[in-house]
Amino acid sequence: MFTLKIENAAGAVIELTHDRKNYGIISVQGLTRPPAQINTATAGTVDGAFYNSARLEMRNIVITVVPFGDIEGNRQRLYDIFPLPHTPCTVYFENKNRSVKIQGYVETLEGDLFQNRETIQVSIICPRPYWQDLTTIYTELSQTLARFEFPFSITEPIPISEYTEYPAATVINSGDVISGLVIHGSVTGAVSGLMIYNSTSGQYIGFDYAFQSGDEITVNTLSGSLSARLLRQGQIINLMQYLASGSKWLKLALGENNFTFAADGAEDITITLETVNLYGGV
């Protein structure tokens, strides 16, 4: 069993499964991993070729649906949910193991209106080919660890927070794709020489910049969205020019990824790692 929903840019949602009164799903194509383009090169008399690189093509989801009941009304409702290609729609898919979504643009919506059983076929092109998990995971890195939770009952004193000289956290990439992440930094005092490390890969990203109380840092390492910005008193400052030498756009390998950070004034900054698992197919 599976659930298929579509959301348009206005936030309207339609479920095409489990609604036999109005719609019947004939088929859904493009749910598994899209084809890859393999780039190779040949050399002299060497048999075969040498691998250079590879990339996944765009995902093409094709939904074939039969409108029931008020056939004309339900067909016209599809026009509203599947917008013209100038605005995106979001496809939600859920099965036993995964609840995911992907954004795309409607390429075609066509059908034969004069068949005894009218069938509508919708083709959606997804420029970014990976399915995204519906759950966003937030992992905190701080020298001060919160220990106070509700509800509680105590008979002897307990710590409500704890200081650690070497903040560390583990992020688990449970998807099947190496992915980026969004790094948030909230500054409450003078902080400089900020370095954020992925101990698993041995890579880091850092900034030669003096941060001050109230600063909000956002570093995006997602493919196609690379950026490093600072929000200070309503003004956005591009931090790209302040990247420390040797900095890399940190990625999440499959499985465990161990993170830590260091800075002068490290007690005055909290780092939050925002991650979403990505999948090649459902």
Q: Predicted segment positions?
A:
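Solvent-exposed edge beta-strands and adjacent loop segments
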Residues: 1-58, 99-110
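Short beta-strand and beta-hairpin "edge-sheet" elements
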Residues: 90-133
